[in-house]
Curated annotation (Swiss-Prot):
Organism: Methanococcus aeolicus (strain ATCC BAA-1280 / DSM 17508 / OCM 812 / Nankai-3)
Protein name: Small ribosomal subunit protein eS24
SUPFAM superfamilies attached to this UniProt entry: Ribosomal proteins S24e, L23 and L15e (SSF54189)
GO MF annotations in UniProt: structural constituent of ribosome
UniProt GO cellular component terms: ribonucleoprotein complex; ribosome
Family membership noted in the UniProt record: Belongs to the eukaryotic ribosomal protein eS24 family.
Keywords for this protein: Ribonucleoprotein, Ribosomal protein
């Protein structure tokens, strides 16, 4: 999977960094967790403060557009993000931990 950053801007009012990207891949669409790990590695970000907001793909296309938010601190992340989004991203982290432990 190859990821190209199309926009990377700081949002000091919301204490976060907003990143838009294009992901090119072969085969199946990458999971939220795969995208999150690749983006955090590329941008040297903390994965616990990274939220994958959206991944949009057209049917039959091997390219996806995505939007990721990287928060400065956990307090800001909990203040601005919906509980469902936080839970989805935490579930993805838990799955990674279980896979690494096996």
């Amino acid at each position: 999977m190859e990821i190209k950053i199309t926009s990377d801007r700081a949002n000091p009012l919301l204490h976060r960094r907003e990143v838009k990207f294009i992901a090119n891949y072969d085969g199946t669409t990458p999971s939220v967790n795969e995208i999150k790990m690749k983006i955090t590695a590329m941008l040297n970000a903390d994965k616990s403060l990274t939220i994958v907001d959206s991944i949009c793909q057209e049917y039959g296309n091997t390219e996806s557009l995505g939007y990721v938010k990287i928060y400065d601190d956990e307090k800001s992340m909990n203040l601005f993000e919906k509980k469902s989004v936080l839970e989805k991203n935490k579930i993805e982290e838990a799955e990674t931990t279980e896979e690494d432990g096996e």
